[in-house]
Amino acid sequence: MSGGSEVVRLNESKRELFENAASLDGIFSPKSVALVHTGLPEAPGADAISTFLNGGFQGTSFVIQPGSSPAPGTRTYARLSDVPCKVDLAVAVTSAEAAPAVVADFVQHNVKGVVLLSPRLGTHDAYSPEAAAQMRSILGSSRTRVIGPGALGVMSPLLGLNATAGLPMAMGGTVAFVCESPLLGRVVLDWSLKHLVGFSSFACVGSMLDVSWANLIDYFGQDPNTRTIALQISSAGNARSLISAAREVSLNKPIIVIKAGLDGHAARAFTWKSRCQSSDSQVLTAALERVGVIEVDGINDLFYTADALSKQPRPRGPRLMLVSNADGPGVLAADSLARAGVELASPSEETRSQVQQLLREENTLDDVLGDGSAENYVAVAKLAVNDPNCDGVLLLLVPWALADPELTAAMLLELRNSSKPILISYLGAADTGSAQEALIRACIPTFSSPEVAGRVFQSMWRYSYELQALYETPVLHAEGDFQTHDFVYQLIVQARSSGRSSLSPEESAEVLARYGIATCGPNVAAVPDRNGVLAKLGLRVDPQFGAVLMFGSVDRGPGVYGDVAIGLPPLNAILARRMLEKSAFYRGLLREYQTGSLRALEEFLVRFSHIASDQPLIEEFEVEGLISPSDVLAISSRCKLHAPHTKSEDLPRPAIRPYPVQYVSPWRMKNGQTVTMRPIRAEDEPLMVKFHEALSDHSVYMRYFQRVKLSTRTAHQRLSRVCFLDYDREFALLAEVRDPHSDDRRIVAVATLVKSPQKSEGEVAVLISDDCQRQGLGKELVRRLIGFARDEGLSRVVASTMFDNFGMSVVFERLGFQLSTDFEEQLVNATLSLDS
C-alpha cells in the first residue's frame, strides 16, 4: 500500500472503559450534592441531612425540602429546579412506591448520581417488578446512575462525603468496601471505627437496580485512592459482567469477598441433583476464585488480609516460617498453624548452622531464646527471611523480663523492604502498644494471635496462586476437532427434534467417546475387573453462571454426594488440577496414588469441560468413573438436554468465555506467504516482545504519535494486559508466520477491537510489521474484525488514522467506512454502521 506506515492508532488506554468507570464519579466523587427530604413519616431524612452537614463535605451542598423552613446553616430550596447550579449527586429518602417519580425528577434535571436511601433502616425496601421496570425505563439511555433503592448510603471519607442514613463518618483509608446488606454495613462500620480501619469509599447499595457489581469493581479498579476492594456479595446479578470486571481488576488490585451463604454442613446436605438448580455460594465462590478473587470467613480476616496485601509483597509459595522468642508459645503456635492447614517451612541446613553459631546453644527457630536480646532475635529473623525454604515469615514475640519490645520493633524495621511478606504476632502484649504502632507505621502488619496471622498468610498465598491461573487460556479444540462438535451437535438436535429431552445410554456413551473419554459403553456389566476408586463427575447449568462442573466421591447414601469440588469450564490441565485440589476426596487420592498417575483424571476433566463449553444444549450430564492408578474409565453416564422448545438465545451464557477458536484460519499474503490468523493468547507475550523489537522508529511514531521507548512498549505489565484479554471487552487478532526450517513462529501483525462499555460500538486498530506492510494484511485484519463485531451484535465500528496514512484510509473506504477529517487532531476518522 502506498504512503506511510500501515498503522492505526490502538486505544491502549481503553478510553471507553475509563469513561464507563468515571460515570460513577457523580456518586463517589461529586462536586455538588442535593439532599432531598421527601417528608416520609418516620423516615431518617433529618438524620441524613444532619449527618451530611457534619461530615465536612468539600463541595457545594443543598437541601431540597418542600413546604418547610430552611434547615439551619443550609441552602434550602423547595424544588430541585430551583437549585442555581448543576447537581452531581442527589440523596433521597424514599419508599419503593415513590421511587419512580423521584428518579424521573432527577433524570429530568440531568443529575449524574442518585442514592435512594431506605425509609426503614437496616432493611431492604421491597418493591414490585412493575416499579423496578418503570425505573429502568425512566433511566433508559440517560447518564444518571442510581444506588438503591433501599440503600444505607455511600461515603467517601477522603472528600468528607457522608451520604448515609445517619451513620457516623468512616475513617479515611485505602480500602473500598461495598455490601448489599444494610445490617452488615452497620456492623462493618462499627468494627472499622473500633479497630481504626479506614476506607477510600464505603457503600451499602441495597437493591442493585442500576449500578452493578461490574460497574463498582471497574470504578474502584481505576480509583487511585483504592488499593484493595472488599465486597459482600449476596447475589451476583449479571454473572458474566461481574466475572469480566473482577478478572480485569484483580490483576492489579486484590478483591476480597466475605464468605456468605451455605456453610459446610449445609452444602454437604445438598443432593447432587439439586446442587446447581440455583446459584448457591459454592458456585459463586468457584467463579470468583477462577478470576483471582479471595474469599475469607469474617470481617477480621477481610480487613487484616486487605491491610497485609496493601503493605506487604505477595508470597511466591505457601511455606511460612515461624520464628519465636519463647519455647512454649512457639510450639503451641506451630501446632495450631499446622492444624489450620498452614504449610510450615523447615529451615535449610545452612540456616540451622548459622542459628547455632549465632546463639551458641541448642535453639531452634521456634525458640530463639539466646540471651533474650533484640539483636539476636532480629539477626535470626533476617536468616529466616533469606532462607530459600520459606515464602513468608511469621515473627512471634512474647514480652518477657529480659526483652525490650520497643528496641526489638525498631530493629525489625530493617526488614520492611523484604521481598517476602513479614507478619508479626505479639502475645500477651498489654505493654507493647508503641512497639506495634511503630511496626504498623512501617507497613509491617501485627496480629493478636499467630492463628489470625496464619490465615492472612494463606489468603495472601491464595491470591498469588489464583493470579497464576488467570493467565491460563484454555483452548476448546485442537485443529480438526470441529468434526467432533458437529457430530455431537447433530446427535443432540436430532434427539430434541424427535421430542426427547435426554440422550439414550448408548448416545451418552457415544458423546463421551467422541470427546476422547474412555468408556465401557452403555453396558455396566462390561466394566473390566480392575482395582480402582469410584468418582462422580457432573455438569449442571446454573441460571446465572451457565455450565458448572462438579467432581466428588460416590456416596452410597440416599442420593447425597459430599465433598464436591466445583469449577467453571473451559479447563486445561492446570485449571483442572486447581479444581480437583479443592476436594478432600482428590487429596486422598493423591496420598494413595502417585501424582503422575492422576494426570489421566485431569485429562478426563479437561475433555469433559470441552463438552460443557461446546454443547450448550446439554442441561445435565452425570458420569460415574472408575479411577485407577493408570487411567479413568467412564462406566455409566446420563445426559439430559434442554427442553425441545427452549430457544438457544434463552439459554444461560457461560461465565467464562473460551478461547474463540472459530476465528483461527490460514490466509495468503500478496507475496504468496501463508500466515495464520488467530486470536491472541496470554502465552504470546514473548512473541509480542520480538514483534515490537522489529518495528522501525517510523512505525512506532505513526502508531503512538510520539516516540516511545522499546522498554516501555515491551514492559511485562503492559504486554501481559495486551495478551491477556477478556473477549467480552476486547478482541485482538494476530497474524503469525512459521519458519519452514526451524518451525519458529513470528508475529507480523496485530489488530484489536475495543468494545464500548455499552457493547454497542467497537474501535478498531491495526499494527503491522515493516517487512509485511503493503501485503493486504491491513484490509484482511479489519475485514475479520468487522465479522467479529457483527457476531458480537455491535451496531458500528470506528477507527482513526493519521492524515498521511493514505493506505489505511483507502482500506477503510473500500470496506464501506464513512470517512471524516479532524483537522485539529490531524486525523481521518472512519465509521462503519453494522445495523443495515
Please place each PLM-identified region on the residue numbering.
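Long, contiguous binding/interaction regions
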Residues: A643-S836
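A structural signal for short, well-ordered beta-strand segments
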Residues: L537, V623-G625, S637-C639, V764, ...
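Catalytic-core regions of core metabolic enzymes
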Residues: S2-S636
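Short clusters of small/polar residues that mark proteolytic maturation junctions
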Residues: C204, S637-R638, P679, T752
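Charge-rich, low-complexity terminal tails
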Residues: I517, G625-S648, V750, L834
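A short local loop/turn or secondary-structure capping micro-motif enriched for an aromatic residue
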Residues: Q354, F545, G557-G559, H642-P644, ...
